[in-house]
A protein has these predicted regions:
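Primarily the internal scaffold of c-type cytochrome electron-transfer domains
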Residues: 1-150, 157-194
Length: 194
């Protein structure tokens, strides 16, 4: 969802692609989730926290990694967006969208951000841009019935649905061994036939 494209009078509206009040967005069907380690806890972006200097500001990154014995591999849908932020103070801003002076009436980001700063009590330098953000949504609803659950080979095959290297394995753990073995041996000899 790209708020930076909102307010464009020249762009044609399309319900699932662009709305003047919201900007552009992409809907996907049968979206393949992203798999990450998750121990049931997450960090949270709090109003006033700095945005990432480079890259993406994660609003609620799941906690856990391959070395965390409490963590399990979880599927997440990751919502990516471009959101307004104060370029001098380097934090996300909460614009007023509805009502008098709101963005949806005036289509003026500077004014909407200024009004939002008055509501939140945050300083606004008068300089804004749009920062890349991500929000992790655990896939715990709208999940297929158990009869349609993935079988082992959906992940443990050459083109499986999990990117093993992205979550800390040197390859498929069926070949390389469990996370305990991998870290116990510090990857020395992992994956070799014994």
């Amino acid at each position: 969802w790209d708020w930076s494209t909102a307010g464009d009078d020249e762009r044609e509206e399309a319900t699932h692609e662009y709305l003047k009040i919201k900007g552009s967005f992409v809907y996907e069907k049968n979206l393949k989730p992203e798999f990450v380690w998750y121990n049931g806890h997450a960090d949270r972006y709090l109003l006033g926290d700095p945005v990432a200097e480079e890259g993406i500001t994660a609003l609620n990154p799941p906690k856990g990694d391959i070395r965390d014995p409490e963590a399990k591999i979880w599927p997440f849908k990751v919502h990516r967006a471009m959101q307004p932020y104060d370029t001098e103070n380097r934090y996300l801003m909460q614009p007023v969208t509805a009502g008098e002076g709101g963005f949806w009436r005036e289509f003026n980001w500077d004014q909407a951000i200024q009004l939002g700063s008055e509501v939140t009590g945050m300083d606004y330098s008068g300089e804004f841009g749009f920062a890349a953000t991500s929000m992790y949504w655990p896939q715990t609803h709208m999940v297929a019935p158990k009869e349609q659950a993935l079988q082992c080979k959906a992940c443990h095959c050459e083109r499986g649905c999990i990117d093993w290297e992205a979550i800390g394995y040197p390859g498929d753990p069926l070949k390389w061994g469990s996370r305990n073995r991998i870290h116990r041996e510090d990857l020395a000899g992992a994956g070799e036939q014994r």
